[in-house]
């Protein structure tokens, strides 16, 4: 099923969670929606085009985006500076990963 096949003006939202294989151990472009699906592909391409980027990555929550960025780009010894009153989930994530040696974190009072 493609947008061209049905003449959709707006890309459809694919709600399927699983996809069949073409044969034994021969997956198609998508096999399970948590790894990717046609809807995410369309949105990622659109975001990359809008931002002039080579690609884009979608995550299911803001916290997963923060976790992805900090674990991909920060290495042991790097310093993350964050506001002392940032979202509690972010604070706990930064603090927890810093205690494990993933990077260093400095919480600052931005009012000073």
Where are these regions (language model features)?
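Residue-level signal for pocket-adjacent positions within structured domains
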Residues: 10, 27-30, 103
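Conserved N-terminal alpha-helix of the aminotransferase class I/II PLP-enzyme fold
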Residues: 18-67, 71, 89-96
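Short conserved active-site loop signatures built around small residues
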Residues: 1-13
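Short, surface-exposed connector motifs at secondary-structure boundaries
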Residues: 50-53, 74-79, 99-101
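Conserved PLP-anchoring active-site segment centered on the Schiff-base-forming lysine
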Residues: 72-90, 109
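PLP-dependent aminotransferase-class I/II
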Residues: 95-112
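Fold-independent oxyanion-binding glycine-rich loops
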Residues: 17-18, 61-62, 83-85, 109-111
């Amino acid at each position: 099923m493609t947008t061209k096949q049905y003449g959709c003006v707006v890309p459809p939202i694919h709600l399927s969670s699983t996809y069949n294989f073409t044969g034994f151990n021969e997956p198609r472009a998508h096999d399970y929606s948590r790894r990717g699906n046609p809807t995410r592909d369309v949105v990622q391409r659109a975001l990359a085009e809008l931002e002039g980027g080579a690609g884009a990555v979608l995550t299911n929550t803001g916290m997963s985006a923060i976790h992805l960025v900090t674990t991909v780009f920060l290495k042991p010894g790097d310093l993350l500076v964050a506001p002392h009153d940032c979202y509690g989930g972010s604070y706990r994530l930064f603090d927890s990963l810093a205690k494990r040696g993933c990077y260093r974190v400095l919480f600052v009072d931005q009012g000073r």
